[in-house]
Amino acid sequence: LFPGFLFTRLDADTAAGKGAHQKLLTEFGRQDSHVLLGTKMIAKGLDFPRVTVAGVVDADSGMYYPDFRAVEESFALLMQVAGRSGRGTTSGRVFVQTFNPNHYCLRLLEQHDYCGFYSIESRLRRKLSYPPFGGLATLCFRGKDQHKVLEAAEATGVLCGANPAVTVLGPVAEVPARQKGIYRYQLTLKAPNRKVLQVVLGELRARITEVCSSGARWYIILE
C-alpha cells in the first residue's frame, strides 16, 4: 500500500519492555520511519512538527460502543488525534474512516465545535435520564460457568426491577463476552437520581446471596 515506507508500531505489546515506549517515539522523532501506527496511546501528548497527516481506522467502533459515554469519549479522542497533525509550519490533514459520516460527533468534530457537541449530547442525556440528569449503575457479573453467570444477572435484574422507580436494562453480554476463560455479563439500573439507586443497591447487597450463586461473582459501578 505504501511502497518504500517504514513503519513504527506503538501499542501495549511493542511498548511492554522497560524503556520501549520512549525508544520507539525517539526513533520516530528522528525520522527512522515514515509512519507511526498505534492504538489510542498515540492520540495525545505527542509533538512531532513534521507530522502532517493523521488517520483513524474504524471510528464507529468507538462511537457505537455500548456505553452512554461512548460518543463523548470518541469526540475527545478524535480531537486529540486531530491535534497530532500540522503542529509545525506545514498545515495538517486528518482522515477518519466511518460508515456514518453524518453522525453529529463527526460533523461537529469537523467544525471543532465543542459547544455544539455539548448542547446535543446533554440534550440526549437529559431525554434518556443518563448522568448527570439521572442515576445510573452498572452491575457486572463474572464467572467460569456461563449459565450460572447469566442466571445470577437475570435474577438480580428481577429483584432490582421490583422497585417501580428503577428501570432495568439487560442483562447483556459485555464486550468481549468471554475473557481469559471468564464469562462477562452486565445489567444497567436507571433511576431519577443517585439516592433512589443507593436504596435499591443497599437492598440488593442484603439479599445478594439469594440470587448470586457461588459460581458467579459481581461488582457495582455507580456513575
Task: Please give the residue ranges for each predicted region.
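Accessory helical-bundle/CTD segments and flexible terminal tails appended to RecA-like ATPase motors
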Residues: 1-65, 71, 80-223
